[in-house]
Amino acid sequence: MRLLLVVALLLAVLPAAAQKRNDKLLNRPYADQKRIHLGFSVGMHLQDLKLTNNGLASDDGQHWYSEVPAYSPGFCVNVLADLRLHKHFNLRFSPGMYFGNKTVHMRESGSGLTRTQDIKSAYVVLPVDLKISGNRYINSRPYVTVGGMGTFDVSKRRSEPIWLNTTDFYLTLGIGCDFYLPFFKFNPEVKFCFGLSDILKHDRPDLVDDYETMKITNSLAKAKSNMIVFTFYFE
């Protein structure tokens, strides 16, 4: 008898729940069927610089070590062009600008001498991503991205111990979710960017007459850049 009551209750509740779900308003139901659509994004990013010290001593016996102890925040803005390839696949191109700063701490192990350098950057970025989306659930749809990003730093340079090359290339992996609002689609996204190149400038003729600075430069083997990007897309 109890089993029959449970079954009867389920039969009464499930159709009502299904009807309630069907009654929910689907915002922009045909938004994902467009072949091409445009948008823009704003957000912030965290920059990191992985420095590899070679441990070599200078001619006067000093050992300098450099590091970036923490991620540094910055601002980013992009435009977006999205090409629909399939129900679950989109190709996205989102050129833009990333503005940021990295602080390098340098220390001589024997004497305890320290020095800092602020590296300001203004990147022109050219990201290309493959967006892989799941199924839409009412007004939301999760997705992941995989792609690459070329960057060109247009900031001014000075004769400092660390001078970075202006170009770099990143492998990118991201995760986000589309939220379908009445008048546009809103997508919060987090992306992890892994630099593939050694961006440290090793040939430094500008430091020929600055031996104290050259000692720090020569103590570094390579430098690679990483970023975490938090973006809000409006499409």
Predicted regions and their residues:
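Short glycine/proline- and aromatic-enriched beta-strand/turn motifs that initiate or cap beta-hairpins
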Residues: 18-72, 233-235
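Predominantly the C-terminal beta-signal and adjacent terminal strand-loop region
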Residues: 25, 166, 179-235
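Outer-membrane beta-barrel channels and translocator barrels
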Residues: 33, 86-88, 135-139, 180-184, ...
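Membrane-spanning beta-strand positions in outer-membrane beta-barrel proteins
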Residues: 37-39, 90, 129, 139-143, ...
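Structural signature of outer-membrane beta-barrel domains
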Residues: 45-49, 98-102, 149-155, 193-199
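Residues on the lipid-exposed face of transmembrane beta-strands in outer-membrane beta-barrel proteins
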Residues: 40-44, 75-83, 95-97, 126-134, ...
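Flexible, solvent-exposed loop segments that connect beta-strands
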Residues: 52-68, 100-121, 154-164, 200-220
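Residues that define the transmembrane beta-barrel architecture of outer-membrane proteins
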Residues: 34-36, 71-75, 120-126, 140, ...
